[in-house]
Amino acid sequence: MTDEPTQTFASIWDALAETPDEAATMRRRAELALAIGQAVEGWNLSQSQAAARLGITQPRLNDLLRGRLDRFSLDTLMALAERAGLAVEMRITRAAA
């Protein structure tokens, strides 16, 4: 064992990201992907059918469902959420000082 101090993080995103801004974006992408995945599961369709419904290829949907979020921009996920019939709302507040 080493005597190096243990670093703690507020969330998994803070641990993975290099900056707080990047962590926030990763968290938002994960939330959108989870909601889209839940919507797709509720359709009871094959991945190919669900992908067609979303306007993407089956391999692309598979990436989304497997959590390969680095392959999706926030904009793309927002568009997919809308195609999945989800209402995406944005709330803007002042950050804590």
Outline where the language-model segments fall.
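N-terminal flexible/basic segments that precede or flank functional cores
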Residues: 1-34
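Amphipathic alpha-helical interface surfaces
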Residues: 28, 32, 57-60, 73-76
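Short basic helix-loop element that most often maps to the first helix and adjoining turn
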Residues: 32-49
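Short alpha-helical DNA-recognition segment
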Residues: 45-62
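DNA major-groove recognition helix of helix-turn-helix
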Residues: 65
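DNA major-groove recognition helix of helix-turn-helix/homeodomain DNA-binding modules
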Residues: 74-90
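Short, charged recognition helix plus adjacent turn
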Residues: 92-97
